[in-house]
């Protein structure tokens, strides 16, 4: 029998168990006051019965190929066992339902345990990703020196530049990739930072409620647009406009430039910066604003001298998180900035980023024992550490320098 069907049946039985426990507790309440409300008695009966059967199904699925290889065609055995466990658990739980039974405490403990498991699972997944990337990166650094990777200025995995280099597979200097990444991120933040902050100030301090109810959702809609759409916009509109404008003034501009990618990426990040800044500004106590206005300060002076200083740690933290978002962007850079590893600070030239090269290295049928493919994991490791540091700095700034108001 299909696992999905078994789980659906267990779910339906759990619903029936809930109403069974609910009816019994309602009957008991007629004679004596219950410790917990009837809904908790139904919930504990449904949770205990269903959870026991679901755990059995999970264990069976995980180990059936190794422990029960001859039973692969006999899922009916699993169905019978799960139903038996369900009714057995339901029977003993049903007997415990009495007036003094602390069903609410049991349900709360189960919910707390479930939340703990979810939190631990998220942490374990992150640790697992980090360890897997470290393992593959270590294989890469066995072939390519770490110093060459971190400080080399030539990136060309497909082109051998010297015979004694690992398998003559090319150059693995990652400096051009990180330079391009930070160049595009810097351009993006020059757009997203001021515009996002100014829009947040307008929405929180100047806009009326009716205007805010219209403008804020429209601004946040930008965050839901797929990045490939932004990429098309960069290729079709922004890049040709920059190239034609540069030609008009006698400036040589590449058809794919860091400026085009950075401008469009900045537009994409504006809702992110605006939303965080708006929340931080609204968190400033109204008493501070009223006090500033009460001593004769204008609204603009209140914003400049009271609101912004009070909200500054949160704003800086939000900007650093936006930088992490910009560093991790891929699609816009692929379409608008190109894939050539060019070490330059000229925004009119084509550059590439770490995320783009990770995609390039892993596209197609690749051998995972070659330095070319393993370089993607090394790039991912450095990018992971970089964004982790930025996120930590952002949280540290918010927590350490946030002013506490009574």
What are the functions of these language-model segments?
Residues 135-175, 230-266, 338:
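Membrane-interfacial helix termini and adjacent extracytoplasmic/periplasmic loops
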Residues 217, 221, 276, 281, ...:
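Transmembrane alpha-helices
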Residues 279-282, 286, 293, 320, ...:
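C-terminal transmembrane helix and the adjacent membrane-cytosol boundary/short C-terminal tail
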Residues 333-384:
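Interhelical loop and adjacent transmembrane-helix boundary motif
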Residues 189-191, 202, 209, 252-294, ...:
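Membrane-cytosol interface at the C-terminal ends of specific transmembrane alpha-helices
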Residues 98-104, 187-219, 394-400:
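Transmembrane-helix boundary motif in ABC transporter permease subunits
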Residues 74-90, 172-202:
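Transmembrane alpha-helix signature in integral membrane proteins
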């Amino acid at each position: 029998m299909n696992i999905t069907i078994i789980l659906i049946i267990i779910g339906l039985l759990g619903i029936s168990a809930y109403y069974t426990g609910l009816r019994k507790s309602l009957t008991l309440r007629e004679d004596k006051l219950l410790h917990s409300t009837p809904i908790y008695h139904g919930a504990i009966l449904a949770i205990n019965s269903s959870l026991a059967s679901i755990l059995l199904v999970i264990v069976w699925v995980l180990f059936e190929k190794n422990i029960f290889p001859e039973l692969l065609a006999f899922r009916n055995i699993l169905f019978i066992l799960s139903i038996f466990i369900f009714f057995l658990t339901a029977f003993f739980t049903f007997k415990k339902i009495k007036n003094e039974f602390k069903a609410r405490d049991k349900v709360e403990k189960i919910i707390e345990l479930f939340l703990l498991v979810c939190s631990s699972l998220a942490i374990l997944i992150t640790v697992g990703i980090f360890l897997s990337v470290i393992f593959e990166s270590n294989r890469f650094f066995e072939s390519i020196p770490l110093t060459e990777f971190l400080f080399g200025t030539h990136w060309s995995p497909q082109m051998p530049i010297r015979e004694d280099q690992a398998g003559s597979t090319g150059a693995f200097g990652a400096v051009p990739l990180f330079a391009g990444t930070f160049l595009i991120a810097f351009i993006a933040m020059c757009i997203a930072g001021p515009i996002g902050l100014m829009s947040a100030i307008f929405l929180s301090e100047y806009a009326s409620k009716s205007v805010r109810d219209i403008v804020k959702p429209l601004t946040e809609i930008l965050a839901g647009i797929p990045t490939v759409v932004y990429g098309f916009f960069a290729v079709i509109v922004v890049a040709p406009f920059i190239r034609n404008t540069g030609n008009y003034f006698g400036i040589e501009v590449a058809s794919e430039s860091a400026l085009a990618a950075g401008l469009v990426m900045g537009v994409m990040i504006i809702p992110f910066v605006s939303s965080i800044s708006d929340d931080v500004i609204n968190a400033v106590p109204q008493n501070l604003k009223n006090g500033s206005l009460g001593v004769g300060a204008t609204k603009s002076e209140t914003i400049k001298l009271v609101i912004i200083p009070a909200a500054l740690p949160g704003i800086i933290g939000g900007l650093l998180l936006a930088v992490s978002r910009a560093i991790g962007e891929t699609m816009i850079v692929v379409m608008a900035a190109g894939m050539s590893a060019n070490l330059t600070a000229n925004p009119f030239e084509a550059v590439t980023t770490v995320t783009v090269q990770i995609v390039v290295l892993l596209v197609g049928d690749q051998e995972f024992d070659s330095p070319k493919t393993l370089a993607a994991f090394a790039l991912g490791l450095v990018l992971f550490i970089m964004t982790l540091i930025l996120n930590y700095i952002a949280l540290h700034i918010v927590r350490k320098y946030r002013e506490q108001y009574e």
